């Protein structure tokens, strides 16, 4: 499970080995300062790996309620085919205090309550039919939103400056597919390179690109809406590229008789 354990160094208390190991293994002050202005979400890791009857959550760091939580060993979560939408979540608990530690713990749970509560953070969701196999071998960018038998990462929040953002897996997938389709638009090339190189992009960068590329309003789109708009951009590249609703050729000329 994800934990946030802080040793309490106080005058008159016995210094314990575990307290020093905690201090050694996690440079707390540096990390807290570095991510202070980041919104809650996954900081790094916490990827989902699919096996036949269980999911593995890989080691990672998440931010919740201003605190960093560390998962230093893979966590195994069993799942079943129910035909209903199921969400894998981190559920955070109230903090506890004893003479040596401030402790903030969590559990990784599978829940059919789709909306995440204030004390929860989504890791993925899926809707698995009985007799089918859960998969994550996406065939294309659209496939990321396939309803049945597919790991869905669209609703996952990643920590970023100011506000949470879209999974870097989704953005890298988009960047790779955009380049492979051969777009000649300079903004496409720049955005694709940035997506592949950085992964975690500020949400405003994504929405500005979408608005400019599609000629639509720049709004705080949801993760699902962002995916849908990015898929439209990929489809426009297949059809010849260019800003939608505008000529993909050179400059326009007007001849007056």
What spans do the regions from the language model cover?
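Beta-strand-rich solenoidal segments
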Residues: 5, 9, 62-257
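N-terminal "first-domain core" detector
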Residues: 1-62
């Amino acid at each position: 499970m994800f934990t946030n354990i802080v040793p309490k160094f106080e005058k008159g208390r016995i210094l314990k080995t575990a307290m020093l190991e905690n201090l050694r293994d996690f440079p707390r002050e540096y990390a807290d300062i570095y991510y202070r202005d980041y919104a809650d979400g996954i900081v790094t890791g916490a990827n989902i790996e699919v096996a036949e009857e269980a999911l593995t959550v890989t080691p990672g760091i998440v931010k919740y309620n201003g605190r960093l939580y560390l998962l230093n060993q893979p966590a195994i979560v069993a799942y079943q085919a129910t035909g209903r939408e199921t969400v894998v979540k981190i559920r955070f608990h109230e903090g506890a205090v004893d003479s040596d530690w401030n402790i903030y713990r969590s559990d990784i749970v599978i829940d059919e309550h789709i909306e995440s509560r204030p004390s929860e953070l989504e890791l993925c969701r899926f809707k698995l039919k009985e007799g089918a196999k859960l998969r994550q071998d996406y065939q294309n960018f659209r496939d990321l939103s396939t309803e049945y038998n597919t790991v869905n990462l669209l609703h996952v929040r990643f920590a970023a400056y100011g506000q949470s953002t879209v999974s870097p897996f989704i953005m890298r997938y988009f960047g790779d597919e955009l380049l492979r389709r051969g777009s000649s638009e300079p903004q496409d090339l720049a955005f694709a390179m940035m997506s592949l190189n950085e992964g975690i992009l500020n949400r405003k960068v994504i929405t500005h690109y979408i608005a400019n590329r599609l000629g639509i309003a720049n709004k705080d789109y949801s993760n699902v809406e962002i995916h849908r708009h990015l898929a439209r951009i990929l489809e426009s590249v297949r059809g010849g590229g260019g800003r939608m609703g505008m000529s993909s050729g050179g400059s326009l000329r007007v001849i007056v008789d």
